[in-house]
Amino acid sequence: MEAEKDSGRRLRAIDRQRYDENEDLSDVEEIVSVRGFSLEEKLRSQLYQGDFVHAMEGKDFNYEYVQREALRVPLVFRDKDGLGIKMPDPDFTVRDVKLLVGSRRLVDVMDVNTQKGTEMSMSQFVRYYETPEAQRDKLYNVISLEFSHTKLEHLVKRPTVVDLVDWVDNMWPQHLKEKQTEATNALAEMKYPKVKKYCLMSVKGCFTDFHIDFGGTSVWYHVFRGGKIFWLIPPTLHNLALYEEWVLSGKQSDIFLGDRVERCQRIELKQGYTFFIPSGWIHAVYTPVDSLVFGGNILHSFNVPMQLRIYEIEDRTRVQPKFRYPFYYEMCWYVLERYVYCVTQRSYLTQEYQRELMLIDAPRKTSVDGFSSDSWLDMEEESCEQQPQEEEEEEEDKEEEGDGADKTPKPPTDDPTSPTSTPPEDQDSTGKKPKAPAIRFLKRTLSNESEESVKSTSMPTDDPKTPTGSPATEVSTKWTHLTEFELKGLKALVEKLESLPENKKCVPEGIEDPQALLEGVKNVLKEHVDDDPTLAITGVPVVSWPKKTAKNRVVGRPKGKLGPASAVKLAANRTTAGARRRRTRCRKCEACLRTECGECHFCKDMKKFGGPGRMKQSCIMRQCIAPVLPHTAVCLVCGEAGKEDTVEEEEGKFNLMLMECSICNEIIHPGCLKIKESEGVVNDELPNCWECPKCNHAGKTGKQKRGPGFKYASNLPGSLLKEQKMNRDNKEGQEPAKRRSECEEAPRRRSDEHPKKVPADGILRRKSDDVHLRRKRKYEKPQELSGRKRASSLQTSPGSSSHLSPRPPLGSSLSPWWRSSLTYFQQQLKPGKEDKLFRKKRRSWKNAEDRLSLANKPLRRFKQEPEDDLPEAPPKTRESDQSRSSSPTAGPSTEGAEGPEEKKKVKMRRKRRLVNKELSKELSKELNHEIQKTESTLAHESQQPIKSEPESENDEPKRPLSHCERPHRFSKGLNGTPRELRHSLGPGLRSPPRVMSRPPPSASPPKCIQMERHVIRPPPISPPPDSLPLDDGAAHVMHREVWMAVFSYLSHRDLCVCMRVCRTWNRWCCDKRLWTRIDLNRCKSITPLMLSGIIRRQPVSLDLSWTNISKKQLSWLINRLPGLRDLVLSGCSWIAVSALCSSSCPLLRTLDVQWVEGLKDAQMRDLLSPPTDNRPGQMDNRSKLRNIVELRLAGLDITDVSLRLIIRHMPLLSKLQLSYCNHINDQSINLLTAVGTTTRDSLTEVNLSDCNKVTDLCLSFFKRCGNICHIDLRYCKQVTKEGCEQFIAEMSVSVQFGQVEEKLLQKLS
């Protein structure tokens, strides 16, 4: 042998032949499967002239027909009118199917010649389908593309009768259907029998041999394009026996089954025909032209014996599970349970299933986090306070998203036989009256007749036909008759399920006691054996689910994580504001009237567009602009609804109108208020909304409320805002002189009116003309705006009624502290300029109109001014509003007589408060505009040096601005810190925003801007000066680095004081070395000004814990903080934290996501996985959190799945915080310290306090960690002190550990 090896001889290796059952043997089968009959002959033959198919019209095909005829004969409808069918547009093609179900969706394709199945992607099949007929090598046929839960689903609607009889819609638990997310028919992911909607795509020449649809299902079949030819064989016992023999013979290709039976019918279906094939009918199909067909399969209660017979045939012919009806016997159990429940009101479902299906009252918890401050503005399609007609309209809106159960008509009776009038959980067999909470829940969930239903369930009446063994409370006041077909079906189901062996009964988990259920069905059959078949034909299904409404959800679900303080305060307000209600659609604005856009993230989530349907939100473009109070809202004081329609006097109308406070959320009549010394602030942007006098008197302020659709209103075609702008522009073009004269006469006219009538007149005139309530300058065209500015600057004169005031000086409208802090900036103003600004503002305050409106009015209007309008406190009537549209600020400049001194003080105090508020809104919106429009500009330009002599905004440009020039409002940055950085700076040391030096731009970019061919980047910012210039021009003896050494010893509060000294110190004190850590912990509101301040300081550590920061804000921040290393986001929402999943996330060292709402294993996977939004050139496929050293995960609902991700993606992890994680156990620690894991050697500190599943065993796993120094097991109930002492003793050989506290182990130095 050695010689043979050395000789270099190589023997040939012989591989053993391996056989694969999936091996393609199509070449062999092509020879074997040669058809033994001529298909062309069968198409021309006159032998198949049976008359089984009945032609009908859609209007005659209703549920009453089903109860009478039981769907036993084939039906053809030459027109789909009256059937309730919905189909795509006529130009819909197979290519559109691919777009809607996904080009990568795998479909089962049948090779017609070999009758062998294979798989293709939709993209591949569409390419084949569009290939010319002459170039097709083979004939492929798609007959099993189920498209539920895809975008195609809601373009196709089944016949109404099919929805009413389908077991899937009416028997299968609805909450299981809602859990279905997988669009394919993978059995492992299937939550219900997914056979409702199929798309069949066949090319010319395709032939499907004789077959019976799986499970004995009936079939609806609509020829959308092309045509079909059917051969039909009735399911007699003889024919079924022949069929079974034919299938088992294996000679299907040799024998045409239609020739073996007594009678067979051939029928041709043309384009637009709808066909119904009953259960058990044997049929073959030929495609004469390329066709596109939509159809579906159903099981129903009117031919159950045939359905069971076909299922048994499938058992005997050994049909593969892939081609059978899924969950067949499970469905049978649910059918029995639903019939028993709807007839006797006794449920055999588990308690959990009953709660899910609204059959009993779910336990409701009261939580301080139950309501968010914006919940009164939540606009959902199924609002819980809709009027009955509004509910119908909303159900029509939701019709395409719902299933057949949602379309099931409710029985006309008000008795317990109605599935919607169900007994509560605590109602027992003795007829005990339900508890009050259950009654309240029923009242919330039932319709207008619910009171009678509750009475009927709580006080049952005796009936002679009480089902045997049924409690007295379950007796219906009106007997429900079952058809003979249903009775036969129920009997067949009971016999079949009883005959099954235990291992094949397939009892679903929702059935609590299957044997008791069978007995209950037998009792029902005994009681209904004498039912009148005529009375059973009612046209109404016996079985249907209770309609789910929005009341099943928590009404005030918070949108984001609230801080504890705000949550508690909100709950207190909730208890006092009993009349608070969720607002509903106005149904008048353009947003309410339009259809879904199909493009926004809410639309993409909807089931009708192929999404999972989890968000339950309406389209962004359909969010109401002006949501109204629901009809159930009543006054908190008198308990009555709004009665403004009962009077004609305008002042009386307002006093009887319901107003909702945007701060305390109380709904009240203004006339019912006892507080008269203060004034309310009416919100023009939202109907029936104000800041009530009580909150205003207490000095509370709230965020301006608007309808959720207001910010999208300008995008709506034909929106109200666009119409207002066009109308306003037309009026300005036609009547400029008339408006000016009206403005001049307005103060005189109003000063003569009675003071008490001023509020009502002004309010209602402006309310009636909605055009003036929502005037927004940012929707104007840029050329109109610039032209108007030029005209107003030329026309300004001391005597004119309308003067230009681009922005009031900051010091004039702010508090004394703010004015003192602005001294430095005011000194930079030119001598005459400051006086001119103050004179103008004083004149506008002292005129007669202002005194009347501020001193005598109980109410005032406030509006959010657009970015280029000024905050205005003096209210204007319609005439002054019209004049204001021609200039940024319009108002009478003539001074009136001085009023009483007290009124003057009150007026000035309110004026300052309002201007402060408006100014803050102005600056916030300006920065929001910058965030959206120029993301990178602000970070660079905000650090540009401040000019030695800034100009006041009152200076107009000396030449008109061309359209291509767009001045930048933030080109100088924001000097000082935002006032909201209160935790770092303190209440008394907030630096002011400086006066803007250039006029604001229009909101939309000028149309004549020509796009550059190359990227234009901003110039680099100039470095801060090295020395401090003095008044005489010389430089201070101490240079910048010396000053920086001094500044490093100052607190952030002191730095803010220094920033107000001069421009040089302002820039020096903003150096990032002085702001390595910024703490905004528990800050109530994160504003754009605060974000800009953070960006300017470039911190290394940022604490945003327990704030309401949004995803957009956090994304904007992390894009501009490349040096950020420590980020604290504890208590925020997952929506905000998900901003870290982007490729722009900095390489953090410390990440704190403790108590983040909604952060679970799936979210951890998104957080730790490599980002998918890499920019061109970014080839790094590693996690952006790979440098994490310290990770805090306390209070999260995570499991070992997340720990595996941590081990994989965080090789440097040293400190891990897992306290209050209830799923962490000893196995989790074993996983962290296993051989080969990076955490075994890198972990130094682990916090497992309050992890109740951790035991002493975990300590033995920690022995593997070579660098462990700190183990916190405090408050772990299953960890003992003895176990800790044993760990210390065993570790003492190599490392000395001690118990600093009980169960707190620390390495001793």
Swiss-Prot record:
Catalyses which reaction(s): N(6),N(6)-dimethyl-L-lysyl(36)-[histone H3] + 2 2-oxoglutarate + 2 O2 = L-lysyl(36)-[histone H3] + 2 formaldehyde + 2 succinate + 2 CO2
Zinc finger (CXXC-type): 579-625
EC number: 1.14.11.27
Protein's GO biological process: embryonic camera-type eye morphogenesis; forebrain development; fourth ventricle development; hindbrain development; initiation of neural tube closure; lateral ventricle development; midbrain development; midbrain-hindbrain boundary morphogenesis
Cofactor names: Fe(2+)
Cross-link (Glycyl lysine isopeptide (Lys-Gly) (interchain with G-Cter in SUMO2)): 830, 863
Residues the record lists as binding Zn(2+) 1: 586, 589, 592, 624
Residues involved in Zn(2+) binding: 635, 638, 661, 664, 669, 672, 692, 695
Stated name of the protein: Lysine-specific demethylase 2B
Gene it is expressed from: Kdm2b
